[in-house]
């Protein structure tokens, strides 16, 4: 057991039992006493002199140590916690990040926004702030107006925009103003954007095809939905599906690709039509949005497992369909990793200048099966 006394310095990050005792002792006294600098020091596992240096900024303190002090101060309600936070931020470079998403009411993009906000709150090494806006449609104009409208208010811009010459030209104009742009999920503006951050979409398509071929009990037909021809990522996923079946499962026939505009109603109607016209339909892959429509159609017309359905992104709808086995697998973007990496790369671009060589920053997808949720 850890003895608690006025001068105890216990690192709660590495000794949870000690932390529990400290917090128990603190709560027993918090009604009678305001938290003091000694309480902060004990919970943070540092000396009172270190807390004093963080508070008053007299001497430099390592960022990790200052963060421990700040976390401890917030945790126990120390009155000067906001001041400690300001001290920590004072000498850090500024990063104002603009984020342009779409489909505001979709669960996935709400989760995206929440993870981006969390990453900004937890960012170290920069004074990060975030502005998030949502495009009302897939129109290139909607994206370009929102992106260029952020000029002068942000230091870097990241977007899930469509692939279109107008978007590319907007990125060129933003670059000329010294604002680096990052393509998220869909690799738009290749050759002029700073980085692409997302999944390797060709591999994603091959993963989907592999699962469908494995789950299907008999040879037959395969359907692929894409959101539209302006989504480069969807086209790469479609290519991955076709290349896998061509190489490893030629007994399956991949039908002509269907456009669903990422809407559930179009996907629902098209899926019911496919099931009616192709009794030997063995698998469906939704390369973009609209998966809710395919799930609803299969629930109406097929028993679980009769048609292998692979979709993207774990949402309440796809999780539920995994549980009842109308979805065979979900291929998900690791949003926490994406947002953390975005902040790191954006900070590097803002402090180091726009790179002459653009890169792709691939993330490992998260794969979910019925037994893993």
Annotate each PLM feature:
Residues 102-108, 131-142, 163, 186, ...:
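Hinge/beta->alpha junction and helix N-cap segments in small-molecule ligand-binding domains
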Residues 156-175, 241, 256-317:
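Hydrophobic alpha-helical
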Residues 245, 334-373:
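Hinge/cleft segment of the Venus flytrap/periplasmic-binding protein
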Residues 166-203, 315-323:
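Flexible loop/hinge segments that line or gate small-molecule binding clefts
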Residues 80-145:
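Amphipathic helical "hinge" segments at domain boundaries
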Residues 1-30, 300:
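Short, intrinsically disordered or compositionally biased N-terminal tails of bacterial proteins
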Residues 16-85:
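N-terminal helix-turn-helix DNA-binding module of bacterial transcription factors
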Residues 204-222:
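A conserved helix-loop-strand patch within extracytoplasmic ligand-binding domains
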């Amino acid at each position: 057991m850890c003895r608690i006394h006025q001068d105890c310095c216990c690192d709660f990050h590495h000794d949870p039992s000690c932390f529990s005792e400290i917090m128990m002792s603190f709560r027993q006294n918090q009604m009678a006493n305001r938290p003091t600098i000694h309480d902060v020091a004990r919970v943070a596992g540092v000396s009172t002199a270190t807390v004093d240096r963080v508070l008053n900024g007299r001497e430099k303190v390592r960022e990790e140590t200052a963060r421990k002090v700040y976390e401890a101060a917030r945790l126990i309600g120390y009155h000067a916690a906001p001041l400690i936070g300001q001290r920590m931020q004072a000498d850090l470079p500024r990063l104002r990040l603009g984020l342009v998403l779409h489909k505001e009411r979709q669960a996935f993009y709400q989760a995206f926004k929440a993870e981006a906000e969390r990453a900004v709150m937890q960012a170290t090494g920069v004074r990060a702030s975030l502005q998030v806006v949502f495009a009302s449609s897939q129109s290139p104009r909607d994206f370009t107006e929102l992106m260029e409208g952020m000029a002068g208010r942000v230091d870097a811009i990241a977007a899930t925009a469509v692939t279109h010459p107008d978007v590319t030209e907007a990125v060129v104009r933003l670059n000329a103003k010294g604002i680096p742009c990052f393509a998220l999920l869909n690799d738009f503006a290749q050759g002029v954007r700073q980085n692409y951050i997302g999944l390797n979409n060709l591999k994603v398509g091959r993963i989907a095809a592999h699962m469908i071929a494995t789950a299907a009990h008999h040879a037959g037909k395969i359907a692929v939905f894409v959101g539209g021809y302006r989504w480069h990522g969807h086209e790469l996923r479609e290519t991955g599906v076709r290349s896998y079946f061509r190489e490893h499962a030629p007994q399956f026939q991949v039908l002509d690709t269907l456009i669903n505009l990422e809407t559930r109603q179009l996907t629902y109607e098209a899926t019911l039509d496919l099931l009616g016209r192709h009794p030997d339909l063995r698998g469906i892959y939704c390369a973009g949005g609209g998966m809710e429509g395919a799930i609803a159609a299969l629930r109406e017309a097929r028993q679980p497992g009769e048609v292998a359905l692979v979709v993207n992104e774990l949402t309440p709808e796809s999780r539920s369909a995994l549980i009842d086995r109308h979805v065979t697998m979900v291929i998900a973007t690791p949003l926490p990793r994406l947002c953390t990496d975005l902040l790191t790369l954006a900070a590097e671009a803002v402090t180091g200048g726009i790179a002459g060589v653009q890169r792709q920053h691939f993330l490992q997808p998260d794969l979910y099966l019925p037994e893993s949720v």
